[in-house]
Amino acid sequence: MSDTLSSAFADTKPHYNILDGLRGVAALTVVCFHLFEAYATSHLDQKINHGYLAVDFFFILSGFVVGYAYDDRWKTMRIADFLKRRFIRLHPMVIIGALIGAVMFYFQGCSVWDVSQVPVVALIIATLMNVLLIPATPGMEIRGVGEMYPLNGPSWSLFFEYIGNILYAFFLHKLSTKVLSILVLSAGCGLAIFALWGPLGDICVGFALTEENIIGGSLRLLFSFPAGLLLSRIFKPVKVRGAFWIGSFSIVVLSAVPRIGGSEHLWMNGLYDTICFAVVFPLLVCLGASGKTTDKVTTRVCRFLGDISYPLYMVHYPFIYLYYAWVKNENLTFIQSLPGAVALVAGSVVLAYLCLKLYDEPVRRFLSRRLRII
């Protein structure tokens, strides 16, 4: 583990450096997955088809880190203090993502969503809702594609992340390891049933207030976050060489696997998703927690990727909307739009780093002092 980390709190435990790096790799796969939405007609032909599974990896990793950092503090820590810490860690980037989305909204018009017809008052209301993480219903969201957060789509997972942290503060941390195991097994079975026999043949859900998204998104959280907590309790490190590179390669390959089974055999893709969230991702978290960076290059790469992972996840999607509109308006192929795609990825990384250093870290330090988090 690295003894240096970007944190608002001096007493935060050292990070697992490799897990930080793997989180950054997963965030980059999400950006690339979203890029190819501009060319997909459905889940069946989406390139980097399983990039959505990165969210399940994030949830497991979040549960693991929260359990590692806080499970032994509850004798001296109040629920309010924990929730303040999580708010300070998570919410500044929720706000900046919403504001970037609002500023760029009227530049994102295309045949799929005619943003020119949206009143400024509606945009202001949507911005406030996104800032406060209040989800929009399909009939009232301003882009017209059914997202909970039409200015910055990925905010949906932060909505569930907050729910996971609230459940942890009031309930999950009190559970014995045995009871927690039963919860994880039950939720995992529910999510597997949704993946195998649900309407989609995948678990790419949670981003809208529809029945299947609410059920699927809730199951994704209720398995993955407690699974991470459980891992933090039972994990025993083993000696592993090259853990970061093995884990990174695995995440990229798993995300890039094409859709399995087509429209006639949806269960086959559901089985793939189940193997990933139930088996592979917990193993990858254990792999990353077991390994140590042994050279300066890997250490720096992991630190950088870990630093930008959350900002990157929260600032890239307004530019995906813009890219999507450009591709649709100009009827571009991927090859024709490749320079723009490269610029989007590189620009998002730069913006994420700038937001981290110029906004997120200073704001977290300020809020920590103001709210007297020690």
Annotate each PLM feature.
Residues 30, 59-65, 98-101, 191, ...:
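Helical transmembrane-bundle signal
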Residues 87:
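Active-site helix-to-loop segments that bind/position phosphate- or nucleotide-bearing substrates
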Residues 90-162, 178, 190-211, 275-289:
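Membrane-interface helix-loop-helix regions
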Residues 2-19, 25-51, 67-80, 136-146, ...:
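Alpha-helical transmembrane segments in multi-pass integral membrane proteins
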Residues 187-192, 321:
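Residue-level recognition of pore/gate-forming positions within transmembrane alpha-helices
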Residues 165:
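Short, conserved beta-strand/beta-arch hydrophobic-aromatic motifs that form part
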Residues 19, 81-82, 90, 157, ...:
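Alpha-helical transmembrane segments and their helix-entry boundary regions
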Residues 56-59, 223:
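His/acidic/aromatic-lined binding-pocket segments of jelly-roll/cupin-type domains
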